[in-house]
Amino acid sequence: MKTPFRKMDGLGNQIIVADMRESTHALTPQAILALAADPQTHFDQIMTIHSSTQKEADFRIEIWNADGSMAKACGNGTRCVIAWLTDHNLGESFRLETPAGIIEGKRQTDNLISVDMGCPNFNAKEMPVSREIADTNYVKITAGPLKDACLVSIGNLHAIFFVEDNIQQIPLEKYGPKLEHDPLFPERCNISIASVTSHKSLNLRTWERGAGLTKACGSAACASAVAAYRRGLTQRHIDVNLPGGTLNIVYREDNHIVMTGPTKYEFGGFLNPLTGTYKKDHF
């Protein structure tokens, strides 16, 4: 019942990558909550690797938040999966089956991993939201100084609020939970505040659905880059500066979003998928 795992850092995003391909047991809610409660294994997302069910993909991944809920996308977690796969000599580029569809990733250098997150979705009915919205670029929703969100789905839904103030001075820990659970979002929402610093860069902070305030969120970085371009604030190729570091985002002419950034190995070992107990080992 030993499942190989790694604790990794995806630009401040705390990620566990677990290889479930040979496991006879699924990861239980008890195990997820136990790992989240342990200071050494506390995580934002768990990325579990499985054999693919589609011939177009090399592997299948599932994504778990720290509260035990499932996510459809996690850009930084996906970059950590790509790093794990390449470190184990399983290839240099991969097509991964995810809850949001098949996405592609590859190692650029020893430290930099790129992931093609696919195309953003601006269709309100597919996000989903609870009321009809004519223009997802400007949505009337307010919390304190935050208003007029831009809604973008990158497999999971993001609300981006652009502000002129220093984003560090806005108490996102206060407004994030309120907006995440707003009745507009029947499946909850990721909440970000962004400040454009030039036509080539912006600063970003994110309250992540199911995880809370986080140092980095890859899909939020992608969503903010797309939102800024839609509003005419930036060009297609920008740097997104997060508390954990910088991600390079390219919103290509073919509508695909490519995210590039570093990953870091913290420790590895084997875990029990039923209980969440683990033993450190070099893995």
UniProtKB/Swiss-Prot annotation:
Its EC number is 5.1.1.7. Its main location: cytoplasm. The record marks 158, 208 as: Could be important to modulate the pK values of the two catalytic cysteine residues. It catalyses: (2S,6S)-2,6-diaminopimelate = meso-2,6-diaminopimelate. It is found in: Cytoplasm. Keywords: Amino-acid biosynthesis, Cytoplasm, Isomerase, Lysine biosynthesis. It comes from the Bacteria. The active site is at 74 (proton donor), 217 (proton acceptor). The keyword Isomerase applies. Homodimer. Belongs to the diaminopimelate epimerase family. This is Diaminopimelate epimerase. The lineage of its organism: Bacteria, Pseudomonadati, Pseudomonadota, Alphaproteobacteria, Hyphomicrobiales.
